[in-house]
């Protein structure tokens, strides 16, 4: 427990130091920064804001977790698998950001390229996970379900789905970073209950990194995490839920990401079926609230108000999960 707290403190301090240096490098190198293509007027002023800040908290968290795990003899297969997903999905996000920022390719990696790289990471994760006796059992609440060979498809769906879901959530200042902190706190409780102090190290380490990042990412954001951060964080949450054998919990602990992704799917489907009509003003759904409150046609919500609304949903989902598990 103490080792995990040390990892969190180390990562927090390194991120607090690293982010300003990263921002200075960005400005000194005259890098263009974040481009804004959204129809939300409030966001146009953010054009040029440094991005790829996830590189900092990702590197500090992975290094701190690896070194502290190694010296505390907690560098288990479970910890290594989560670090692997963080690194690999972080690399996918880094390539995507690099193409957008440095090569001026607005799309970054195309969907097929991104999916292929995420699939490769997911397949490697599954086979490593399976080789160490994890089995093919999916726990739904307290009911074990044997999936057999289908479990590999579930793992791929879980990793890729939540990786992209957190990416969709990262649309306004501070929203994704604190939403993930809330999710990680819930998984920290589960890890402690299971006495998985190895996994607790990377959980607390990332919490420290995200809190350090939030100092510069809250409104008005001085830096964005970019795909390098959001894709890695989503993959990490999925990997943690799998490693703790509590996969179903991510549907509630990650209810914010589920809500955001579902809103996009509903919008696209309805738009195609009705020949151009919309359910929401704009998706992901946090933009709907920005533009017109709960109904989408009322008074605009500030980014802080949207943040607190979604963080509240995340807290409720996490508390409900813990209540189901332990009460």
From Swiss-Prot:
It catalyses: UDP-N-acetyl-alpha-D-muramoyl-L-alanyl-gamma-D-glutamyl-L-lysyl-D-alanyl-D-alanine + di-trans,octa-cis-undecaprenyl phosphate = Mur2Ac(oyl-L-Ala-gamma-D-Glu-L-Lys-D-Ala-D-Ala)-di-trans,octa-cis-undecaprenyl diphosphate + UMP. Pfam families: Glycos_transf_4, MraY_sig1. One of its GO terms (cellular component) is plasma membrane. Its EC number is 2.7.8.13. Keywords: Cell cycle, Cell division, Cell membrane, Cell shape, Cell wall biogenesis/degradation, Magnesium, Membrane, Metal-binding, Peptidoglycan synthesis, Transferase, Transmembrane, Transmembrane helix. It comes from the Bacteria. Pathway: Cell wall biogenesis; peptidoglycan biosynthesis. GO terms for molecular function: metal ion binding; phospho-N-acetylmuramoyl-pentapeptide-transferase activity. GO terms for biological process: cell division; cell wall organization; peptidoglycan biosynthetic process; regulation of cell shape. The chain crosses the membrane at residues 3-23, 51-71, 75-95, 115-135, 140-160, 172-192, 197-217, 223-243, 248-268, 306-326. Its cofactor is Mg(2+). It is a multi-pass membrane protein. It is found in: Cell membrane. The keyword Membrane applies. Catalyzes the initial step of the lipid cycle reactions in the biosynthesis of the cell wall peptidoglycan: transfers peptidoglycan precursor phospho-MurNAc-pentapeptide from UDP-MurNAc-pentapeptide onto the lipid carrier undecaprenyl phosphate, yielding undecaprenyl-pyrophosphoryl-MurNAc-pentapeptide, known as lipid I. Belongs to the glycosyltransferase 4 family. MraY subfamily. NCBIfam families: mraY. This is Phospho-N-acetylmuramoyl-pentapeptide-transferase.
